[in-house]
Swiss-Prot record:
This is Nucleolar protein 16. It comes from Danio rerio. Residues 1-34, 56-79 are annotated as: Disordered. Residues 1-31 have a biased composition (Basic residues). Keywords: Nucleus.
Length: 171
């Protein structure tokens, strides 16, 4: 008993079609993914890119926005804009003004190294450079940068360390 014609043809490869070209064509036609959540929320599928950005009060590019050389005699007048969605700009400005936390940190080895150097030599970076614990032969400026990095990344820990040094010296 034979197989159905459709089931035999289903798994055959069509050599006449360029799959790479078809995939590129599909990717070009599909809608772009918008990273910014404010723009994505306010985007209208039925409008063009230029119309959407104009409604939001955004510029599609920098070309022609600002004059290269302002003329001396003419006054620069502000452009008239019909911003239909001003909340997009406000949300984007609010997000940009929020300061992100600094993710830089110090390794435990570097913290121990800096604490040893400060404990032995206080703020004398030249003496730190000559210290025998300076295995990597850091210059005074490199050591200073490491101490400043430690101060910036762990300010509470550094303050507690300095306070403990002061209490040890006073006793």
């Amino acid at each position: 008993m034979g197989k159905i014609k459709k089931s035999r043809k289903r798994n055959t490869f069509n050599y006449n079609k360029n799959k790479k070209k078809l995939k590129k064509k599909l990717r070009r036609k599909e809608k772009p993914h918008i990273e910014c959540p404010q723009i994505r929320k306010a985007w209208d599928e039925h409008k063009t890119v230029k119309q959407n950005l104009q409604d939001m009060g955004l510029a599609p590019g920098t070309k022609g926005m600002l004059p290269i050389k302002p003329k001396k005699n003419t006054k620069v007048e502000p452009m008239e804009t019909n911003v239909l969605k001003p909340y997009v700009i406000e949300e984007m400005e609010a997000e940009a003004s929020v300061r992100g936390n600094d993710r830089t940190t110090c390794s435990t080895d570097m913290i121990e190294y800096v604490q040893h150097m400060v404990k032995e030599h206080n703020e004398d970076y030249k003496a730190m450079a000559r210290d025998e614990k300076n295995y990597y032969q850091d210059t005074p400026k490199q050591i200073k940068r490491k101490v400043e990095l430690y101060k910036r990344c762990h300010p509470e820990q550094y303050a507690a360390f300095i306070a403990s040094l002061q209490s040890q010296k006073s006793t």
